A protein has these predicted regions:
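Trp- and acidic/polar-enriched beta-sheet ligand-binding modules for extracellular glycan
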Residues: 22-41, 80-82, 106-113, 122, ...
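Bacterial N-terminal signal peptides that target proteins for export
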Residues: 1-7
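Hydrophobic h-region of N-terminal signal peptides that target proteins for export
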Residues: 12-19
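Predominantly extracellular/luminal regions of secreted and cell-surface proteins
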Residues: 60-96
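N-terminal pre-domain segments of enzymes
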Residues: 22-69
Length: 222
């Protein structure tokens, strides 16, 4: 075996070792869930882009880099609706995920967003959103975007989008709509860096308002 071949083998081996080490450095994301709180009779929800109901089934586990933690608790929240109908914007990151009249913020109708300022650019690996889990309902046009621009004009990365018909004008999404439960909607975010995280929605199957109980962003300092 000549020197060139040995060098190529050594490089290939180092790549494999690095990949294995990186994989071992990952862990399963653990999301602390609030108690279930469905009230009343479940409605027959009809929507063309709905995922199969989860029931007692668990979502596939999300793998994140070791040391990943909640980086959004207590962070400043702004919104397209500066005067919420119910609640306060601070509820979105206060850590209280339980459902009652004092834990969620209600925004006006049509397309609205809430935006979390992480304070500085962070490495973001996952997120979980709880809109309103007091009953089974589906929120429309749920979109999550990340940017270092607070106005979301430059460098915007869309990491979740179930607006299948582009009715909120943020592009057509491939994710499915889902029924709200106490488990929220967690999703992985692959190697994205940013300071601001914006969640958008456009009403729900019960009424035209937009609600947020809690949003958790998971990541690490750079």
């Amino acid at each position: 075996m000549n020197l060139k071949t040995l060098t190529m083998v050594a490089l290939a081996t180092s790549v494999v070792i690095a990949a294995v080490a990186q994989e071992k450095a990952k862990e399963t994301l653990k999301v602390e869930l609030p108690k279930p709180c469905f009230t009343g009779t479940p409605k027959d929800i009809k929507t063309e882009n709905l995922e199969a109901p989860m029931g007692d089934k668990e979502r596939d586990p999300i793998q994140v880099p070791a040391g990943t933690k909640v980086i959004s608790k207590g962070c400043k929240v702004t919104s397209s609706d500066s005067e919420p109908i119910i609640g306060e914007l601070g509820f979105v990151t206060d850590g209280d995920k339980d459902h009652d009249a004092t834990t969620y913020v209600e925004l006006g109708p049509n397309t609205q967003w809430v935006q979390i300022d992480l304070g500085k650019e962070k490495q973001i690996s996952a997120a979980c959103v709880w809109h309103f889990h007091g009953e089974a309902r589906v929120y429309r046009d749920v979109v999550c975007q990340i940017s270092n621009d607070p106005d979301f004009i430059d460098g915007v990365q869309t990491v979740f989008n179930n607006d299948h018909d582009d009715s909120s004008k943020l592009g057509k999404g491939k994710d499915k709509e889902y029924i709200e439960t106490n488990k929220g909607r967690p999703f992985a975010i692959s190697n994205v860096k940013g300071r601001y995280v914006r969640f958008t929605s456009r009403g729900n199957t019960s009424n035209e308002m937009n609600h947020y109980t809690e949003i958790e962003i998971y990541g690490k300092d750079l």
